[in-house]
């Protein structure tokens, strides 16, 4: 085994930071990546492999999630097994106590080693019913529906556009042979990572996995780059109580040097919820505008990143169907400011919010384990929280303005909406809001 470490140069005990990610390459080529934290009350360990809906086509859409759900349904004494399904990877995570992490690691290794036998002996009927119910739930929830169709419209023609859990139609036709072909292609040593987080000994866990993991050799499948397409999808439904919309531009990928810059830019506009007790004290200028004219109930800006591309924009819920166009006008005109008149105070506040959000997202061993796996699989390494904070702190106002000029100003947008969207005017009307006369 080849052992290494990207640990922090010094442990900041006051904040109880983790010791950084430690890596071990097993004799079979699989990477074990762990982050230990002496303050952790529980531990998690997971098997992750690059796949997800991006590895599928329209006829096999859902096979990644179905296969992972089957593997995660095995009995697990002393551990809680959970399936993790994303657009670019899948995982089976065992949550357990710190003292039981070695046994959980053996369990994960056993599932990986016997994945083919597990799938061959499993009747997929109930699993397909469960996955179809999950896919239907996505379409039944307005927010999930809008964002799912936003990705599908933005990356249409590419596998990145496919729903993470498939559709009821595609799932119905999946068979055991589809899962076996999926495993043969994606569950291979160069496409697999064992990730873990908690309070345990890295070397003991790596040794336990080394002794129990048998996995096929294979190369990491190549992914076809996805192009962003300015477009729109409208799913008007007047039976719903509100308008649910999302507007976005082409964002940054996980591998982009501007990954954190995009997050700071999104945080400049932030979130707003009309019925919150702190609504009147929300800082961004857009929040003041929407309260003055009472044109939106809630919105949140986001920067969603995949391995090589991303989406940057907002999701909004509007109770008054006659103010949809008002909100899109004011929100997109605020985006114009990103490359013109963003202030030092706005950037400083946004940087603080991004750092807080990052720390909050990694508040438990399950979240840290998933984050380690995602970054190692899709980027090749994972930065520590300290390194991320240093990059965020280095962002200046001019950096944000330059990013706004190149990624937001007068750029194509993608629009997705459902509910009372009669007042969501045509694409060209909103596209023209992406710039303004300057002299």
Curated annotation (Swiss-Prot):
<keyword id="KW-0249">Electron transport</keyword>
<protein>
    <recommendedName>
        <fullName>Cytochrome b-c1 complex reductase subunit, mitochondrial</fullName>
    </recommendedName>
</protein>
<keyword id="KW-0679">Respiratory chain</keyword>
<dbReference type="InterPro" id="IPR007863">
    <property type="entry name" value="Peptidase_M16_C"/>
</dbReference>
<dbReference type="GO" id="GO:0009060">
    <property type="term" value="P:aerobic respiration"/>
</dbReference>
<dbReference type="GO" id="GO:0004222">
    <property type="term" value="F:metalloendopeptidase activity"/>
</dbReference>
<dbReference type="GO" id="GO:0045275">
    <property type="term" value="C:respiratory chain complex III"/>
</dbReference>
<dbReference type="InterPro" id="IPR011765">
    <property type="entry name" value="Pept_M16_N"/>
</dbReference>
<dbReference type="InterPro" id="IPR050361">
    <property type="entry name" value="MPP/UQCRC_Complex"/>
</dbReference>
<keyword id="KW-0809">Transit peptide</keyword>
<dbReference type="GO" id="GO:0046872">
    <property type="term" value="F:metal ion binding"/>
</dbReference>
<dbReference type="GO" id="GO:0005739">
    <property type="term" value="C:mitochondrion"/>
</dbReference>
<keyword id="KW-0496">Mitochondrion</keyword>
<dbReference type="GO" id="GO:0006627">
    <property type="term" value="P:protein processing involved in protein targeting to mitochondrion"/>
</dbReference>
<dbReference type="GO" id="GO:0008121">
    <property type="term" value="F:ubiquinol-cytochrome-c reductase activity"/>
</dbReference>
<keyword id="KW-0813">Transport</keyword>
<comment type="similarity">
    <text>Belongs to the peptidase M16 family. UQCRC1/QCR1 subfamily.</text>
</comment>
<comment type="subunit">
    <text>Component of the ubiquinol-cytochrome c oxidoreductase (cytochrome b-c1 complex, complex III, CIII), a multisubunit enzyme composed of 10 subunits. The complex is composed of 3 respiratory subunits cytochrome b (COB), cytochrome c1 (CYT1) and Rieske protein (RIP1), 2 core protein subunits COR1 and QCR2, and 5 low-molecular weight protein subunits QCR6, QCR7, QCR8, QCR9 and QCR10.</text>
</comment>
<keyword id="KW-0472">Membrane</keyword>
<dbReference type="GO" id="GO:0005743">
    <property type="term" value="C:mitochondrial inner membrane"/>
</dbReference>
<dbReference type="GO" id="GO:0006122">
    <property type="term" value="P:mitochondrial electron transport, ubiquinol to cytochrome c"/>
</dbReference>
<dbReference type="Pfam" id="PF05193">
    <property type="entry name" value="Peptidase_M16_C"/>
</dbReference>
<dbReference type="Pfam" id="PF00675">
    <property type="entry name" value="Peptidase_M16"/>
</dbReference>
<dbReference type="InterPro" id="IPR011249">
    <property type="entry name" value="Metalloenz_LuxS/M16"/>
</dbReference>
<comment type="function">
    <text>Component of the ubiquinol-cytochrome c oxidoreductase, a multisubunit transmembrane complex that is part of the mitochondrial electron transport chain which drives oxidative phosphorylation. The complex plays an important role in the uptake of multiple carbon sources present in different host niches.</text>
</comment>
<feature type="transit peptide" description="Mitochondrion">
    <location>
        <begin position="1"/>
        <end position="17"/>
    </location>
</feature>
<keyword id="KW-0999">Mitochondrion inner membrane</keyword>
